[in-house]
A protein has these predicted regions:
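Conserved, well-structured ligand/cofactor-binding cores
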Residues: 1-463
Length: 463
């Protein structure tokens, strides 16, 4: 391998000749061999750095044109566009497990953009610190990159995944309207419910989760950039924070603003805790939905068997013919991961000492992982399971009419205690509720038939 010599304030460093990064990135690459190739800083963060560095150059060009010249701006902008496109991803090797401020990832961006900009300009006009990092600090750039990436992963990944599954559930509601089945509470038989009513509960959970996620976005759209090292804005020109937020908004197509209090923006990560709480709520609902689906599909002979789901692959290496609810299992594992990430994010966010939180990379990594995993799991569940759900009407009807909880319909006519006696007699003697009720002398056979209508129990207020 060929090397080039780069230098920083600590001296010279050998760097692979075919890479755009410089001395500080190489030092980090050598000093933090933790999770190499597995836990690289998320590409969403890299892309966000591309946006914010271009926005910073635009703002500096407007406020300090003698330093950020048009020539520099042009070269930097092109280099940033390449970072945004992902074509320079191979030049961002650093892992999450580095300095807690994200300084080395900020310098990775500065060095790559500077070296690429110099290559574009065909001369050395850009310095990583003096030009690419102009008016900035790692302490305000990393929080900014994290907010940009968080908004993007929610709006561009999670929201479409939610919308897709909601649309599928709406379709299933229409297809299964009026199919009455046994309700269940505590994993025990309960009064009847229609299958479309049950599905509507799933759908509404997801719609509510989207609303909660949406409520977190205004906080995430406040950017720390302009606060520099401790929130005072030292070395940034007046108005830089507003202009850079405007530039980020224009570049991303999302309505970012400058954070009203930069001291809070640097040291507190409560916005991400709040937003991830909504992601955790979505994970909890997906866990519940996946569990409902696999319970309802359990069997094929010894389970509930009330729905059919797609058979995607063999389920056992020893039991021939076995097919498992694998999409449901994947969703539940992702949900567990998200819940673990939430604990990590909450604890890391509590560790902001004085003017800076130095757990920022792990917060960013876990947040993005949660949103990405959950979005992809939901799309996979939709494509390979939800769209193929169908009701086993015969099994639903059989289970409904064998449920002792249908006795609840008799409460207004014979009272709670007599209804309980009826249920116990039916169970103990393995007879029908009608036989038990009539046998106990509570109702005549004719009156029982008049008031006992299981399907109607799912619609008590329907005329």
């Amino acid at each position: 391998m060929e090397y080039k010599i780069e230098h920083d304030s600590m001296g010279e460093v050998k760097v692979p000749a075919d890479k755009y990064w410089g001395a500080q990135t190489e030092r980090s690459h050598e000093n933090f061999e933790i999770g190499i190739g597995i836990e690289t800083m998320p590409r969403e963060i890299t892309k966000a750095f591309g946006y914010l560095k271009k926005a910073a150059a635009i703002a500096n060009n407007a406020l300090k044109p003698e330093k950020m010249t048009d020539e520099k701006l042009k070269a930097i902008s092109q280099a940033c566009d390449e970072v945004i496109s992902g074509s320079l991803n191979d030049h961002f090797p650093l892992v999450v497990w580095q300095t807690g401020s994200g300084t080395q990832s900020n310098m990775n961006a500065n060095e790559v953009i500077a070296n690429r900009a110099n290559e574009i300009a065909c001369k050395k006009i850009c310095h990583p610190n003096d030009d690419i990092n102009m008016s900035q600090s790692s302490n305000d750039t990393f929080p900014t990159a994290r907010h940009i990436s968080a908004v993007a992963v929610i709006e561009d990944k999670l929201f479409p995944a939610i919308d897709t599954l909601v649309a599928t559930f709406k379709k299933l509601e229409k297809e299964n309207e009026g199919i009455v089945k046994s309700g269940r509470t505590h994993l025990q038989d309960a009064v009847p419910i229609s299958f479309d009513q049950e599905i509507s509960g799933w759908r509404t959970s997801l719609e509510r989760d989207k609303e909660m996620l949406s409520s977190s976005l205004p906080y995430l759209k406040q950017l720390a950039l302009g606060g520099t090292a401790v929130g005072t804005g030292l070395n940034a020109p007046k108005g830089f924070d507003v202009k850079v937020a405007e530039a980020v908004s224009k570049l991303t197509g999302k309505d970012f603003i400058t954070a009203p209090n930069k001291f809070h923006a640097l040291t507190s990560k409560d916005e991400l805790v709040f937003a991830h709480g909504a992601i955790k709520a979505l994970a909890a609902d997906m866990m519940k939905i996946a569990n409902d689906v696999r319970w309802l599909a359990s069997g094929p002979r010894d389970g509930l068997g009330e729905i059919h789901i797609p058979e995607n692959e063999p389920g056992s290496s020893i039991m021939p013919g076995k097919v498992n609810p694998t999409q449901c299992e994947a969703v539940t594992m992702v949900a567990v991961q998200v819940m673990g990430n939430d604990s990590a994010i909450g604890f890391a966010a509590s560790q902001g000492n004085f003017e800076l939180n130095v757990f920022m990379p792990v917060i960013a990594y876990n947040f993005i992982q949660s949103a990405r995993l959950l979005a992809e799991a939901m799309l996979s569940f939709n494509k390979n399971c939800a769209v193929g759900i169908s009701a086993n009407k015969e099994k639903m009807h059989f289970n409904l009419y064998n449920s002792l909880m249908l006795v609840t319909a008799l409460n207004p006519y014979i009272g709670y205690e007599n209804a309980a006696k009826t249920a116990h007699k039916a169970f103990d003697e393995n007879i029908s509720l009608k036989e038990a009720c009539v046998g106990l002398g509570f109702l005549t056979a004719e009156k029982f038939d008049e008031v006992f209508k299981p399907e109607a129990m799912a619609y008590p207020h329907k005329n």
